[in-house]
């Protein structure tokens, strides 16, 4: 009976460690996805500012 209890505790411990590792990996992947999304938004922001600046420059050149 003691052997079964120790075995059960060992299995539960290994399962919890495995679950913890999986959760950590999942959290890291989620953070990477969020970082990539933020970088993409930042790039889009810069591109729109550049396009707006070019448009303003070209309209100024055409008027001048």
Curated annotation (Swiss-Prot):
This protein's species is Phyllomedusa sauvagei (Sauvage's leaf frog)
Name it: Phylloxin-S1
Q: Which residues lie in the propeptide?
A: 23-44
Tissue-wise, where is it found?
Expressed by the skin glands.
Give start-end of the signal peptide: 1-22
Instruction: Return one Gene Ontology term, BP aspect.
Output: innate immune response
GO cellular component terms? extracellular region
Swiss-Prot/TrEMBL keywords: Amidation, Amphibian defense peptide, Antibiotic, Antimicrobial, Cleavage on pair of basic residues, Immunity, Innate immunity, Secreted, Signal
Secreted in keyword set = yes
Name the InterPro entries on file: Frog_antimicrobial_propeptide, FSAP
User: In which family does this protein belong, per the annotation?
Assistant: Belongs to the frog skin active peptide (FSAP) family. Phylloxin subfamily.
Task: Mark the residues carrying the PTM Glutamine amide.
Answer: 63
Physiological role? Antimicrobial peptide against both Gram-positive and Gram-negative bacteria.
The UniProt entry lists the main location of this chain as secreted
Indicate where this protein resides in the cell: Secreted
């Amino acid at each position: 009976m003691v052997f079964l209890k120790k075995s059960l505790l060992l299995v539960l411990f290994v399962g919890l460690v495995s679950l913890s590792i999986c959760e950590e990996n999942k959290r890291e992947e989620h953070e990477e996805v969020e970082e990539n999304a933020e970088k993409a938004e930042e790039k889009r922001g810069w591109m729109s500012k550049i396009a707006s600046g070019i448009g303003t420059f070209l309209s100024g050149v055409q008027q001048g």
